[in-house]
Curated annotation (Swiss-Prot):
Chain segments annotated as coiled-coil in the UniProt record: none
Topological domain ranges for the Cytoplasmic compartment: 917-940
LRR repeat windows: 108-136, 137-163, 165-185, 186-211, 213-232, 233-255, 257-279, 281-304, 306-330, 331-354, 355-378, 379-402, 403-426, 427-450, 452-475, 477-502, 503-522, 523-546, 547-570, 571-593, 595-615, 616-639, 641-662, 663-686, 752-776, 777-799, 801-824, 826-849
Membrane spanning residue stretches: 896-916
Protein name: Receptor-like protein 9b
InterPro entries, per the entry: Leu-rich_rpt (IPR001611), Leu-rich_rpt_typical-subtyp (IPR003591), LRR_dom_sf (IPR032675), LRR_N_plant-typ (IPR013210), RLP_Defense_Trigger (IPR051502)
Positions bearing carbohydrate: 53, 63, 66, 101, 115, 151, 270, 304, 361, 389, 402, 434, 463, 685, 783, 799, 831, 836, 867, 873
One GO CC annotation: plasma membrane
Keyword Transmembrane helix on entry: yes
Pfam family, one: LRRNT_2
Membrane topology note: Single-pass type I membrane protein
Organism: Arabidopsis thaliana
Alphabetically ordered keywords of this record: Cell membrane, Glycoprotein, Leucine-rich repeat, Membrane, Receptor, Repeat, Signal, Transmembrane, Transmembrane helix
Signal peptide extent: 1-28
Length: 940
């Protein structure tokens, strides 16, 4: 039987079907997460890709022939409903154009977020709308151009983006005063980050930014008044750290009642800690550290700040003290407490009232006695404990405890006993342990092997001895950095196979190690190895060529033999130091290191000639005190080498003019060789400090630890989160040795950047001293002593305005000492002894401090320095006329002297021999004396 449906029922059914179809479409939309992007925006993205030279990595954007959905492309975010592009992440572009064309963003009219951080364009332009580019992006709320290197020229473009709520300018080259006028139209700003720029001066009235909730001005050069900040009544987070603010903290800050984060650390605020902080009822993060505060600080100021979670206080003045309040029970419960340089003698009692501390930093105080192990017992969630630079003397640990502590720093205390045997059992989760600069003794406890997660271990500068425990070598499989230097460890380094598959940095210098065992061979991850100043014997293992070292230090050991050729073929080297051993054989023909690498092969027994290509990629080349021979090669061009040290070999020939092409040289040492000929006049082309292209600093180890646990102790809402993370890197020191001011000094780090010197002493150089050397205005040390240089001291030496040491002793120089040399204000050493100089010694300036030892051996000099009067006018006139007569007469006189001496010597011997030919009593006495001497010698 057929059922009949009314028209109304049919209409309802059709409507239900339609609804179901719509629901299916919505369901399909939800399944895909978005609808396809519009074609105009897709083409706009492809134009961006072409203009920005974007490769497939790190951008997964297809080519023009692929009609894929751009909403699915990486770094592109679309609205789920409209399919319009609302977010672009254009960070880390490898080869961007010099200028960014802002008109390329016109197609993205709904854009809300634009991230151009680490983009590294030099500036912006728009040929269509000029500065009004961002005016077209009416929905743009977040703009991030951090770490770009742009300057203030981009600010007029940004000022038209009136819809902006978040603006991040961190890490650029902006300068001048606070950019209030340049950003006057950004009235909707809620977060402004100006950190890590070069802004200066006071803070203006910021009432125009009435919506601002987060302001980061850190790491600039702001100074003067900061009262303009008091207008920001809605401000919740304020970071003024690392600036140059001075004086008292403004009292008007107590009106910022909504502040949750206040960081004024690393400034020059002085006086007592501002009492206004007691009124900041909403504050959760309060950092007052690294200022010049002094006097007593009472915890009563913060006792009622019930929301406080992080409190940091320290002072560079060393005049800040914490007032003792034993009965104080604050309302806050801290997660982080830092009280550095507060002259604490005991752990403050209020800490006992805290229930869940994660970070305790009491470093740089005066804590004494036993390590406060009760902190481990009371706070099971404690993750960071910093007690370095105190005076603790005894390390005791709880017996039955398995703690979650991850960072412990006890360096620079007065511990002088053995480590607790259970240290590894108590701290099995430790990741960063620093026990350096103490007096710990005996061998390492085997329980170190329980530290499965440890990544950084510093045991340097103690009195540990013995060999490394096998349980330690096998158990600490996560170790990244191991520092054992300045102890008494002995035996072979890693005598057996280890489990250090992640070890990158091994620093074990200044111990008693005697050999390199095969256990080291398996640590292929090593990038830094320092075994200098030990007693290593034998040869460098051939398998060393399999490592990709960046830094290798084997100096001052007993190693010998030739060097493995594979050692010099790695492009990763930055420093290779094999000095102070007994290596022999020829030098390698090349050194394939990284740009600006340092090569030390000095104080060995290398022989043969110097390869001309050895200098190619080096910043410092030290070949001093070997057995190298031949001539100085015609080095290949190197515009960056700063120091060339060839002293103490047997090099012969002339000084090649090719050295004048090493324009960046700061220190050139060719002393103690057998070089002949004249000094090249073109040496004035060498920099010696006149062209400072770059400076050399301590190398930060380029190895970081990717740690999942960043030790986040407080998460900020608006400004960039600050997280606690230890420094796993450290600084590598390098040095260059050079003789100056009558002593041999080692120039390290920054001191090298201020040293410029030329040493050609103890050779066989002749001829005049080139007047062109007077062009080396920034040179600080000049040594031409112990040669056969003749002629006059150049008058141009008066131009050496930075000179500190001039040594011209033991030459054949004649004539007067130029009086203008008395204008050299920095000169400490001026030695011209044992020459043929004449005339008066300058008596003004630095010459008034010189004694007679600097002028001895010059019979015709006079002056107060040698207590010889110059009042005899006839003598003075004679000396002056003699000086003007030229070199020829002086040369003839010297020849007559030498010929006369030789003739006298020859005539004396001939007379003696003729005398013996005649029979006489004297002849018989002489031969009797000779016979008696021979008999006596035979008896002996």
């Amino acid at each position: 039987m057929l059922m009949m449906f009314s028209p109304a029922f049919v209409m309802v059914m059709d409507l239900m079907v339609l609804v179901m179809m719509i629901m299916m479409m919505v369901s399909s939309l939800d399944a895909h997460g978005h609808i396809s992007c519009i074609e105009s925006e897709r083409k706009g993205l492809l134009e961006l890709k072409a203009y920005l030279n974007i490769s497939e990595y790190p951008y997964d954007w297809p080519n023009d022939t692929n009609n894929s959905d751009c909403c699915k492309w990486e770094r592109v975010k679309c609205d789920l409903t409209s399919g319009r592009v609302i977010g672009l992440l254009l960070t880390d572009t490898y080869y961007p154009p010099p200028l960014l064309n802002l008109s390329l963003f016109y197609p993205f009219g709904e854009l809300q977020t634009l991230n151009l951080s680490n983009f590294w364009c030099q500036g912006w332009f728009d040929h269509i709308h000029g500065y009004k580019s961002f005016e077209r992006l009416k929905n743009l709320e977040i703009l991030d151009i951090s770490e770009n290197g742009v300057n203030n020229t981009v600010l007029p473009f940004i000022n038209t983006a009136s819809s902006l709520k978040t603006l991040i300018l961190h890490g650029n080259n902006m300068e001048g005063t606070f950019p209030m006028k340049e950003l006057i139209n950004l009235r909707n700003l809620e977060l402004l980050d100006l950190s890590k720029n070069q802004f200066v001066g006071p803070v203006p009235d910021l009432a125009n930014f009435h919506n601002l909730q987060g302001l980061d001005m850190s790491d600039n050069k702001f100074s003067g008044s900061n009262k303009g900040l008091c207008q920001l009544k809605n401000l919740r987070e304020l970071d003024l750290s690392q600036n140059k603010f001075t004086g008292q903290f403004p009292q008007c800050f107590d009106s910022l009642t909504q502040l949750q984060v206040l960081d004024i650390s690393s400034n020059n605020f002085n006086g007592t800690v501002p009492s206004l902080i007691r009124n900041l009822d909403s504050v959760e993060y309060l950092a007052l550290s690294d200022n010049e505060f002094k006097g007593f600080f009472s915890l009563e100021l913060i006792a009622n700040l019930s929301k406080l979670k992080v409190f940091k206080l320290s002072s560079r003045s060393n005049l800040l003290r914490l007032k003792k309040l034993s009965s104080l029970q604050p309302k806050f419960q801290l997660s982080v407490i830092e009280l550095q340089n507060c002259n604490l003698e005991n752990v403050p009692s209020f800490i006992q009232h805290q229930k869940d501390l994660h970070v305790i930093n009491l470093s740089n105080n005066k804590l004494t006695g036993v390590f406060p192990y009760w902190l481990l017992e009371k706070y099971p969630n404690l993750r960071v404990l910093l007690l370095q630079n105190n005076s603790l003397t005894m390390l005791e640990l709880p017996r039955l405890l398995n703690h979650t502590l991850q960072i412990l720093d006890l360096s620079a205390n007065n511990f002088d006993q053995r480590l607790p045997e259970n240290i590894g059992k108590v701290l099995p989760n430790i990741r960063h342990l620093n026990l350096s600069n103490n007096g710990f003794q005996w061998i390492l406890p085997s329980s170190f092997g329980e530290m499965k997660d440890i990544k950084f271990l510093d045991l340097s500068h103690n009195n540990f001895s013995g060999s490394l425990p096998m349980k330690f070598l096998i158990g600490c499989s996560s170790l990244h950095t191991l520092k054992l230097s300045y102890n008494k460890f002995f035996g072979q380094i890693f005598p057996k196979q280890t489990n250090f598959g992640s070890l990158v940095v091994l620093i074990a210098n200044n111990n008693l190690f005697t050999g390199i065992a095969d256990g080291l061979r398996n640590v292929q991850s090593l990038g830094v190895l320092d075994l200098s100043n030990n007693y290593l014997q034998g040869v460098i293992p051939s398998w060393f060529g399999g490592f990709f070292f960046a830094y290798l230090f084997l100096s001052n050991n007993l190693l010998e033999g030739t060097l493995p050729s594979t050692l010099f073929s790695k492009p990763t080297f930055k420093i290779l130091d094999l000095s102070g051993n007994k290596f022999s054989g020829n030098l390698p023909s090349h050194f394939t290191g990284m740009d600006m690498s340092l090569l030390y092969l000095n104080d060995n027994e290398f022989s043969g000639t110097i390869p001309s290509t050895l200098i190619k990629d080096v910043l410092v080349l030290d070949l001093r005190n070997n057995k190298l021979s031949g001539t100085i090669p015609h080095f290949v061009k190197n515009e960056f080498i700063l120091s060339l040290l060839l002293r103490g070999n047997t090099l012969t020939g002339h000084i090649p003019t090719d050295l004048c092409g090493l324009r960046s040289i700061r220190i050139l040492d060719l002393a103690n060789n057998r070089l002949k000929g004249s000094i090249p006049t073109c040496l004035n082309n060498v920099s010696f400090g006149r062209r400072l292209n770059y400076e050399v600093n301590g190398d930060k180890l380029p190895f970081e630890i990717n740690d999942d646990e960043e030790f986040a102790v407080y998460s900020r809402l608006l400004v960039l989160p600050r997280q606690y993370s230890p420094d796993y890197t450290g600084v590598l020191m390098f040095n260059v040795e050079f003789a100056s001011k009558s002593r041999y000094d080692s120039y390290t780090q920054e001191s090298f950047n201020f040293m410029f010197g030329l040493d050609l002493s103890s050779n066989e150089l002749s001829g005049d001293i080139p007047k062109e050397l007077g062009d080396l205005q920034r040179i600080r040390a000049l040594n031409l002593s112990h040669n056969s240089l003749s002629g006059l001291i150049p008058q141009s030496f008066s131009n050496l305005t930075d000179i500190e040491s001039i040594d011209l002793s033991f030459n054949l120089l004649r004539g007067p000492i130029p009086q203008d040399l008395s204008k050299l204000d920095y000169m400490v050493v001026f030695n011209v002894s044992y020459n043929n100089l004449s005339g008066s010694i300058p008596s003004h300036g630095k010459f008034s401090t010189l004694d007679e030892t600097n002028f001895i051996g010059n019979l015709l000099l006079c002056g107060s320095a040698i207590n010889r009067s110059c009042d005899d006018n006839s003598t003075t006139e004679f000396l002056e006329s003699d000086d003007q007569s030229g070199d020829e007469e002086t040369t003839i006189d010297m020849e007559i002297f030498y010929w006369s001496l030789a003739a006298t010597y020859g005539v004396t011997w001939i007379t003696f021999i003729v005398f013996l030919c005649f029979d006489s009593p004297w002849r018989r006495v002489w031969f009797h004396f000779v016979d008696a001497f021979i008999s006596l010698f035979k008896c002996v």
